[in-house]
């Protein structure tokens, strides 16, 4: 799961530095809570963005991990109203975009340097997930076909998703695809959730 606050630079200029920092802190806390409650691992934060991982080994199955990822996204999307209200903003001023992807060949592990610890993952799918998120402009959620197809019938039904009825687009052909998306993930099939 990759998530990022759209329009954060203009927002940071309109708010006082202290107010924007408080907003970023609230957003980080909300994202951590949603990811952890869903059974995921928070990888890292980059300003107002978050990277999280949902592992089949810890969630119980590939389907459970995919369900947890989608559930965390939905929970975080729902928490935006509270983050906005606590920051004296209307919810339409906080727009998150999400990229959800599945990687079967990822290497996930911890890195500790100078007392700082971070969970990270290595693999092509990490770059692809970042490109999916970057293309999800306008507060959209784009999920890869490989993630959606991990869902078994019960988990898909619980999420009110019918994988057989999903319509996909190729990432590199989206109007929102930038040079990096066309270079790193041109053939990744995605759908909007």
Question: At which residue positions do the language-model features occur?
Answer:
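Hydrophobic alpha-helical membrane-association signature
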Residues: 20-27, 68-72, 76, 125-128
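Intrinsically disordered, glycine/charged-rich C-terminal tails and inter-domain linkers
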Residues: 106, 117, 128, 137-193
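Catalytic core of nucleotidyl cyclases, primarily class III adenylyl/guanylyl cyclases
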Residues: 3, 34-67, 82-124
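Catalytic-site or vestigial catalytic-site microsegments of nucleotide-handling domains
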Residues: 1-10
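Conserved long alpha-helical elements within nucleotide-processing catalytic cores of c-di-GMP signaling
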Residues: 9-32, 43-44
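A generic structural signal for short hydrophobic patches within well-formed alpha-helices
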Residues: 8, 50, 59, 147-148
């Amino acid at each position: 799961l990759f998530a990022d606050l759209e329009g954060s630079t203009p927002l940071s200029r309109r708010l006082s530095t202290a107010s924007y920092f408080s907003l970023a802190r609230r957003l980080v806390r909300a994202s951590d809570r949603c990811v952890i409650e869903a059974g995921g691992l928070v990888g890292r934060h980059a300003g107002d963005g978050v990277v999280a991982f949902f592992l089949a080994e810890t969630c119980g199955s590939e389907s459970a991990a995919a369900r947890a990822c989608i559930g965390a996204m939905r929970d975080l999307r729902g928490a935006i109203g509270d983050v906005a209200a606590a920051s004296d903003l209307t919810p339409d001023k906080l727009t998150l975009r999400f990229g959800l992807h599945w990687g079967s060949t990822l290497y996930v592990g911890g890195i500790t340097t100078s007392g700082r610890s971070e969970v990270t993952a290595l693999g092509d799918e990490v770059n692809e997930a970042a490109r999916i998120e970057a293309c999800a402009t306008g507060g959209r959620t784009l999920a890869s076909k490989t993630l959606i197809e991990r869902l078994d019938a019960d988990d898909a039904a619980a999420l009110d998703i019918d994988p057989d009825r999903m319509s996909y687009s190729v990432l590199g052909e989206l109007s929102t695809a930038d040079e990096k998306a066309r270079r790193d993930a041109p053939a990744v099939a995605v759908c909007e959730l």
